[in-house]
């Protein structure tokens, strides 16, 4: 028995899926969650615009989340806390992606494809992420020096 839904927000979809899985375990609706995150972005990318395609593509990630007392793997990570944030920006837009592009009136129209001002997005996101991480660590009473690994983004090797 289980449930699933589609959440296509590219670089954040895995983190939102993990948050949902953690919440399901914490509230007792699940003991174990397999979070599979297929990202199919290539069909709505503007391949002639490097800012819009260089970090995106088709990929899938998966993670098993479970209660600590049920975990048996030698490779375990404890979720100490979760915190998500979204912020609207006109510097990155999907314009309904696949749905909008299927309308015959929009075939070949640039505004029907994903678009981003990559450098502007980078300048918006970096300070927001730094504040998010340091604030969350502070709320968890975890010194920055004690952090050995962060999973921030499933982008390509160029990032």
Stretches found by the model and what they are:
Residues 47-127, 131, 135:
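Condensing-enzyme catalytic core mediating Claisen C-C bond formation in acyl metabolism
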Residues 1-32:
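Conserved catalytic cysteine-centered active-site region
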Residues 1, 34-41, 101-106:
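Acidic-glycine-rich active-site phosphate/pyrophosphate-binding loop
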Residues 147-159:
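Glycine-rich phosphate-binding loops at beta-strand->alpha-helix junctions
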Residues 24-59:
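Flexible, glycine-rich active-site loops centered on histidine and acidic residues
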Residues 131-148:
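Phosphate/pyrophosphate-binding loops at sites that engage ATP/ADP/AMP, CoA/4′-phosphopantetheine
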Residues 9-14, 37-43, 83-87:
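Acidic, glycine-rich active-site loops and adjacent beta-strand->loop/helix elements
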């Amino acid at each position: 028995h289980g449930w699933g839904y589609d959440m296509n927000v590219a670089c954040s979809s895995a983190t939102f899926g993990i948050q949902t899985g953690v919440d399901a375990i914490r509230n007792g609706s699940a003991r174990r969650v397999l979070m599979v995150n297929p990202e199919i972005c290539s069909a709505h990318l503007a391949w002639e615009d490097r800012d819009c395609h260089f970090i995106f593509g088709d990929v899938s990630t998966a993670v098993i989340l479970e209660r600590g007392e049920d975990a048996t793997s030698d490779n375990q990570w404890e979720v100490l806390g979760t915190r998500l944030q979204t912020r609207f920006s006109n510097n990155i837009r999907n314009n309904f992606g696949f749905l909008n592009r299927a309308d015959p009136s929009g075939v070949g129209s640039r505004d029907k494809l994903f678009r981003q001002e990559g450098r502007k997005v980078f300048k918006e996101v970096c300070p927001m992420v730094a504040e998010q991480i340091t604030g969350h660590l502070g709320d968890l009473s975890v010194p920055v020096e004690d952090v050995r690994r962060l999973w921030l983004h499933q982008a390509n090797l160029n990032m």
